Amino acid sequence: MHPILEAFWYILPAYFANSSPVILGGGTPIDFGKTWRDGRRIFGDSKTWRGFLGGLTVGTLIGVIQQIIYPYYPSLSLAFKVSFLLALGALVGDLIGSFIKRRLNLPPGYPAVGLDQWGFLISALCFAYPVHTIPTGEVLLLLVVTPLIHWGTNVLAYKMKWKSVPW
């Protein structure tokens, strides 16, 4: 597989996991409405259990479907593990970003350049690293193009009325 395609094929579960809570979310907040020592919400109402578990499921399923379509990994079980870890890492990275944004007193949905685009990506790569990784050049490519993809998908989600703001 060409290195550019390999990079995107590898990270696709994280991309899907990160974007699907916009559609699947709602319900009980992950922080259960609790506040941190600074009196601000830990994550906020926009980070919900349904969105987190939905994103984890979608990201993992995307990886399994990818493995069926094009066997990239030596086994389906490895594809499942890597996809699960990429999805989990993306969602945890997004939660960390929300936590930081709340500490900076930024409202939910407010853009934080770099944090929104790279936080989920770096966390996903770190979570999956013990099981499988990609070459450094492909990681660098993803660091460059992910902000553009993130911006484009946010604009699309806004136009589809899945998001109230285009960022």
From Swiss-Prot:
Bilayer-spanning residue ranges: 4-24, 51-71, 80-100, 104-124, 139-158
Localization of this protein: Cell membrane
Catalytic activity: 2,3-bis-O-(geranylgeranyl)-sn-glycerol 1-phosphate + CTP + H(+) = CDP-2,3-bis-O-(geranylgeranyl)-sn-glycerol + diphosphate
CC annotations in GO: plasma membrane
GO molecular function term, any single one: CDP-2,3-bis-(O-geranylgeranyl)-sn-glycerol synthase activity
Keywords recorded for this protein, A-Z: Cell membrane, Lipid biosynthesis, Lipid metabolism, Magnesium, Membrane, Phospholipid biosynthesis, Phospholipid metabolism, Transferase, Transmembrane, Transmembrane helix
Involved pathway(s): Membrane lipid metabolism; glycerophospholipid metabolism
Membrane topology: Multi-pass membrane protein
EC class of the enzyme, as a word: transferase
Biological processes per GO annotation: glycerophospholipid biosynthetic process
Cofactors that this protein relies on: Mg(2+)
Domain of life: Archaea
Enzyme Commission number: 2.7.7.67
Function: Catalyzes the formation of CDP-2,3-bis-(O-geranylgeranyl)-sn-glycerol (CDP-archaeol) from 2,3-bis-(O-geranylgeranyl)-sn-glycerol 1-phosphate (DGGGP) and CTP. This reaction is the third ether-bond-formation step in the biosynthesis of archaeal membrane lipids.
Family as reported in the entry's similarity comment: Belongs to the CDP-archaeol synthase family.
PANTHER family in UniProt: CDP-ARCHAEOL SYNTHASE
Name under which the protein is recorded: CDP-archaeol synthase
